[in-house]
């Protein structure tokens, strides 16, 4: 059959920009999927999706005008039911054949197949392959029905009676197979043709008559002034943004924001980047405020200098390309000025009150109906932060003479004071005008206002950083004060929400508990904090009084699950991760070293045998119940058990010393020499001896072995 390329376009009013790319991919993807299912494409068919503010389209190569005829075998009924004793068709069989468009003359051609215990009749026929127009109609209906439409509109067709539900009113449908219009294809009250429309203002031809499926993109570009491909349009905008920054000079660069670039790509059909500017006096306002208002409200790209500082210039992606762009530039500069003036006003007004003076206002801000106000939350965070700071300082002071002295006490008092001040003031920017207008700036504005109030840098940084990390890959708090307050804030959220039963379910996580858990993990691991997880959770629960249930064990499971998932994403195998997490390590900061030790151990020749033996030991001890690891040498009878005991006495102290010093790799490698005595023990010694004293002694020997082997990880989890 003659393959031709297929083009389908749905021409609509301006689509929601944040949903455009998803809509375009879904529309084209379902069309291809449905045509493939009907046998209308080849094995080499390729899909190109198009999506612009006013169109969704798909170009599919090697599409057949009709699907090939297909042999169909339909199960009818058992022979005993369909044929009588003389081999004549029964009324039941004749009725079934009539329903299939056949008659008694077809009975001799029926196929008999053994199906289980009975012989069954099958009717074989050739099904006519679907015509492309019919197949496309089905595919188009399915593609429209499956579009991930964020919000549906209802509108009437020109007849004034028929209502249509779609994301935006549709005004045109193109369906071309090669150069031929697929007659009869319809969608949303429209009949397919070969005409579409280009740019609202700059098309040189309107309507644009598409000559063939393959000329679609080029004709829209040359005649319609439209770049139909989302990806090509995005790349063109990125190119123009950089070119405009280069023209400005001085090493400036446009801010990098993939989401903003996607949104702007969905707003224009023919991008034209222009350089605009605002008064330099606005640069006295924190740049985060100016950047956010330009990006969120105006979809502008601020220009940053080589040091990442905001300049007074910005880039606008216009949808028109006039010969004289001065009016467009002036219009955008005029529009942004009031936005920046508002930000300056908020900043100036907010600084008239100190953060301390705003603390009482938090008592009027509801946090959660079961957990009270933001004021109550602040007191909980202070309680938790003090406990964490004390634990941290105590851990750091161990073995550190400088901290375990009078100077150390002064340092501890300063740390506790800074932590308490930061925890007290961390949420006060929630009641400022700036954060009320731009919630995304919470924490950031608190840091600026803390500097304005003359607070120590550690406190200002902690207030700014206490929400970090906000997302995957985000920076962590800079100093210990910020780390402590950030940990306290996240633990308050986790313990509180778990305590009232607000747990993540499936895709729903309204309180971002997964993100909070990963934040706790990242800080503990990447900052190498000498803090125990159970101690952290235990310090947080009392802060809630009787408002919550103590769900520390459940929350710990949740955190270990998040940790395991994160480690697998970092490239560790499921077995390696499982072996370490099975021990529920308290110091998460040590987990990376444990994993590296396990990975090195698995490369040893002795590893498989020791892992298998460890699994066997685990099962024996599990059945034995409580086992005393004490070994009575006088009860050791067999040479193999004496050799194992001697090996443990010789190598375990060395392995333990290496473990205690943090050299987990060396510890496991030292224990690898136990392979031979362990193998010999299981070959030659009956563990469950009839004599009780002998049995308990051998179980104790295995317990001693088990304790020595599984300090770094549960090696039984490595057994294949």
From Swiss-Prot:
Compartments in which it is found: Cytoplasm
Coiled-coil blocks: none
Enzyme Commission code(s) on record: 6.1.1.14
Biological processes per GO annotation: arginyl-tRNA aminoacylation; glycyl-tRNA aminoacylation
GO cellular component, one term: cytosol
PROSITE patterns associated with the record: AA_TRNA_LIGASE_II_GLYAB (PS50861)
Reaction catalyzed: tRNA(Gly) + glycine + ATP = glycyl-tRNA(Gly) + AMP + diphosphate
Record InterPro entries: DALR_anticod-bd, Gly-tRNA-synth_bsu, Gly-tRNA-synth_heterodimer
Alphabetic keyword roster: Aminoacyl-tRNA synthetase, ATP-binding, Cytoplasm, Ligase, Nucleotide-binding, Protein biosynthesis
KW ATP-binding (keyword) present: yes
Principal EC category: ligase
GO terms, molecular function: arginine-tRNA ligase activity; ATP binding; glycine-tRNA ligase activity
Pfam (any one): tRNA_synt_2f
Family the entry assigns: Belongs to the class-II aminoacyl-tRNA synthetase family.
Name of this chain's protein: Glycine--tRNA ligase beta subunit
Organism: Acidovorax sp. (strain JS42)
The organism's taxonomic lineage, starting at the top: Bacteria, Pseudomonadati, Pseudomonadota, Betaproteobacteria, Burkholderiales
């Amino acid at each position: 059959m003659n393959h031709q390329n297929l083009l389908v376009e749905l021409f609509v009013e301006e689509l929601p920009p944040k949903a455009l790319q998803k809509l375009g991919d879904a529309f084209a993807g379902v069309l291809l999927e449905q045509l493939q299912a009907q046998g209308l494409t080849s094995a080499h068919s390729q899909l190109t999706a198009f999506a612009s503010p006013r169109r969704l389209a798909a170009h599919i190569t090697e599409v057949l005008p009709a699907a090939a005829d297909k042999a169909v075998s339909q199960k009818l009924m058992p022979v005993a039911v369909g044929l009588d004793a003389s081999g004549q068709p029964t009324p039941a069989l004749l009725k079934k054949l009539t329903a299939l468009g056949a008659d008694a003359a077809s009975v001799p051609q029926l196929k008999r197949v053994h199906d289980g215990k009975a012989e069954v009749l099958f009717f074989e026929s050739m099904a006519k392959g679907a015509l492309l127009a019919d197949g496309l109609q089905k595919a188009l209906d399915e593609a429209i029905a499956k579009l991930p439409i964020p919000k549906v509109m209802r509108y009437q067709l020109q007849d004034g009676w028929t209502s249509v539900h779609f994301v935006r009113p549709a005004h045109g449908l193109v369906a071309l197979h090669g150069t031929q219009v697929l007659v009869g294809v319809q969608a949303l009250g429209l009949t397919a043709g070969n005409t579409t429309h280009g740019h609202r203002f700059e098309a040189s031809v309107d309507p644009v008559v598409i000559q063939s499926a393959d000329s679609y993109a080029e004709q829209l570009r040359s005649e319609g002034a439209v770049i139909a491909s989302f990806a090509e349009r995005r790349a063109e905008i990125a190119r123009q943004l950089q070119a405009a920054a280069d023209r400005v000079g001085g090493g400036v660069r446009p801010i990098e924001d993939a989401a903003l670039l996607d949104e702007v790509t969905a707003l224009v059909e023919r991008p034209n980047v222009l350089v605009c500017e605002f008064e330099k006096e606005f640069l006295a306002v924190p740049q985060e405020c100016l950047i956010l208002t330009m990006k969120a409200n105006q979809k502008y790209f601020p220009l940053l200098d080589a040091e990442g500082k905001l300049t007074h210039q910005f880039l606008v992606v216009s949808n028109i390309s006039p010969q004289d762009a001065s009016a467009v530039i002036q219009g955008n500069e005029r529009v942004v000025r009031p936005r920046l003036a508002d930000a300056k006003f908020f900043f100036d007004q907010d600084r008239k009150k100190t953060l301390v003076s705003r603390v009482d206002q938090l008592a009027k801000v509801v946090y959660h109906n079961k957990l009270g106000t933001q004021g109550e939350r602040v007191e909980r965070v202070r309680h938790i932060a003090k406990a964490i700071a004390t634990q941290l300082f105590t851990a750091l002071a161990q073995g550190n003479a400088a901290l375990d002295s009078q100077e150390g006490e002064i340092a501890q008092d300063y740390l506790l004071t800074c932590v308490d001040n930061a925890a007290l003031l961390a949420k006060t920017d929630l009641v400022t005008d700036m954060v009320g207008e731009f919630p995304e700036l919470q924490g950031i504005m608190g840091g600026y206002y803390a500097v304005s109030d003359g607070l120590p840098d550690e406190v200002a940084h902690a207030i700014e950083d206490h929400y970090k990390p906000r997302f995957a890959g985000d920076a962590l708090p800079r100093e210990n004060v910020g780390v402590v307050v950030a940990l306290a804030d996240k633990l308050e959220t986790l313990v509180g929400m778990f305590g009232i039963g607000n747990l993540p379910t499936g895709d729903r996580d309204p309180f971002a508990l997964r993100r909070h858990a990963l934040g706790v993990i990242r800080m503990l691991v990447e900052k190498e904090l000498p803090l125990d997880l159970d101690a952290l959770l235990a310090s947080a629960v009392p802060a809630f009084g009787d408002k919550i249930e103590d769900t520390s064990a459940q929350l710990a499971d949740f955190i270990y699950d998040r940790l395991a998932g994160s480690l697998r994403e970092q490239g560790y195998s499921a077995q390696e991760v499982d072996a370490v997490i099975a021990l529920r390590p308290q110091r998460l900061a040590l987990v990376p070293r444990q994993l590296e030790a396990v990975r090195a151990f698995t490369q040893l020749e002795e590893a498989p045998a020791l892992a298998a033996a460890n699994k066997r030991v685990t099962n024996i001890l599990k059945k034995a119940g409580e086992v005393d690891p004490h070994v009575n040498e006088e009860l050791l009878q067999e040479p193999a058990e004496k050799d194992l005991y001697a090996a443990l006495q010789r190598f375990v102290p060395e392995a333990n010393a290496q473990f205690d010093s943090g050299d987990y790799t060396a510890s496991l490698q030292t224990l690898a020499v136990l392979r031979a005595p362990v193998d010999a023990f299981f070959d030659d010694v009956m563990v469950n001896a009839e004599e009780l004293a002998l049995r308990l002694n051998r179980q104790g020997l295995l317990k001693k072995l088990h304790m020595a082997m599984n300090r770094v990880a549960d090696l039984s989890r490595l057994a294949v």
